[in-house]
């Protein structure tokens, strides 16, 4: 039983990690804020599946405020672990971007009986992240896992806004054979996340494998 619970805890950590990274799916035109683009979509929703079962949704809201891009994320999911325990996951986060860098963010995550709040803000050439455990300080341009602008993923490290930790990444892109668009893989230290985009860089799908639980998949809801 101890070994089973150890696997369970590890799987839950990866599941929550993947969920918290899913930060937006927005279609842009060729002029405006952030990487020279404007927002076309104001609200985008993803259905979330674990295996073949729908376990919840993740909704994203986008707003241009002057030179800033404001992104709000809300997730609500319930999934079962080893057929005997339901886990409730609730998440809300707010990010503010400018000039391809994160200006500030705040996040609140409830998973089961635990709750975590984190916030961060740019101060000149420093980005300070704080939570109940203290502060972390980073230098230079900080970026989170901005799936909605794939060029922003091309960095050596990306910020996990759930816990305020910079994660080493390597991104590989490849064309989709026999269909339009392209795919991208975010290689993490112990796992990977596969993404699908349309030709206009519109993010439409996410997939990753969770040990013992199966495939986690985000699928964009077409309205």
PLM features: residue spans?
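Bacterial N-terminal signal peptides that target proteins for export
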Residues: 3-17
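Solvent-exposed helix/loop surface patches that form functional interfaces
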Residues: 39-41, 106-213, 218-220
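N-terminal mature ectodomain segment of secretory-pathway/periplasmic proteins
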Residues: 40-44, 48-122
């Amino acid at each position: 039983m101890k070994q089973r619970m150890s696997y369970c805890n590890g799987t839950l950590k990866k599941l929550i990690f993947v969920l918290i990274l899913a930060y937006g799916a927005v279609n842009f035109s060729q002029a405006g804020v952030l990487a020279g683009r404007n927002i076309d979509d104001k609200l985008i929703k993803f259905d979330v599946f674990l295996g073949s079962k729908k376990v919840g949704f993740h909704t994203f809201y986008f707003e241009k405020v002057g030179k800033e891009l404001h992104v709000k994320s809300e997730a609500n999911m319930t999934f079962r672990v080893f057929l005997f325990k339901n886990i409730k996951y609730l998440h809300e986060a707010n990010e503010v971007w400018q000039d391809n860098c994160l200006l500030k963010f705040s996040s609140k995550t409830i998973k089961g009986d635990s709750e975590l709040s984190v916030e961060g803000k740019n101060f000149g050439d420093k980005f300070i992240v704080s939570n109940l455990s203290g502060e972390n300080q980073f230098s230079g341009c900080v970026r989170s896992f901005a799936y909605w602008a794939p060029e922003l993923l091309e960095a050596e490290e990306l910020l996990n806004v759930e816990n305020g930790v910079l994660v080493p990444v390597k991104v590989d892109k490849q064309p989709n054979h026999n269909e339009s668009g392209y795919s991208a893989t975010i290689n993490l230290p112990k796992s990977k996340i596969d993404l699908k985009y349309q030709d206009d860089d519109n993010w439409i799908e996410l997939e990753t494998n969770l040990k013992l639980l199966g495939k986690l998949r985000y699928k964009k809801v077409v309205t």
